[in-house]
């Protein structure tokens, strides 16, 4: 893991030069997409990551879905986020291959039932760290 040394800061100009611009939401080098959903009492937070050769990764999307964790309308918006597709530069659509959904902090049966709906090999219930 990377550790910042006290007093060490990246040069803003160097960082600006390294910035990459994409014409699509998914960079060309991405081979597949994964996601994680964090469960909270008042929201769900989902992050979608694109993975390329050599474990290179890109944050593709971040969604915060506000609402009670057990409200059907909130869960329908989570379903939409799970089923969202992402576009490559050539116009091809990609969907998320695997999703880990945190069961901690809420009634886990909500996550289990929703995972079954989407397919347990695609949406996998997990116990997140406390």
List the predicted regions and their residue ranges.
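Metal-dependent catalytic core segments for phosphate chemistry
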Residues: 1-7, 39-81
């Amino acid at each position: 893991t990377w550790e910042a040394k006290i007093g060490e800061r990246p040069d803003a100009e160097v960082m600006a030069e390294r910035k990459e611009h994409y014409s699509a939401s998914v960079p060309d080098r991405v081979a597949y997409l994964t996601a994680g959903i964090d469960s909270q009492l008042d929201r769900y937070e989902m992050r979608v990551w694109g993975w390329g050769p050599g474990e290179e990764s890109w944050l593709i999307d971040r969604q915060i879905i506000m609402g009670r964790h057990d409200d059907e309308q909130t869960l329908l918006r989570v379903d939409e986020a799970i089923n969202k597709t992402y576009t490559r530069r050539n116009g091809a659509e990609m969907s998320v291959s695997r999703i880990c959904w945190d069961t901690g902090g809420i009634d886990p049966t909500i996550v289990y039932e929703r995972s079954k709906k989407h397919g347990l090999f695609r949406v996998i219930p997990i116990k997140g760290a406390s």
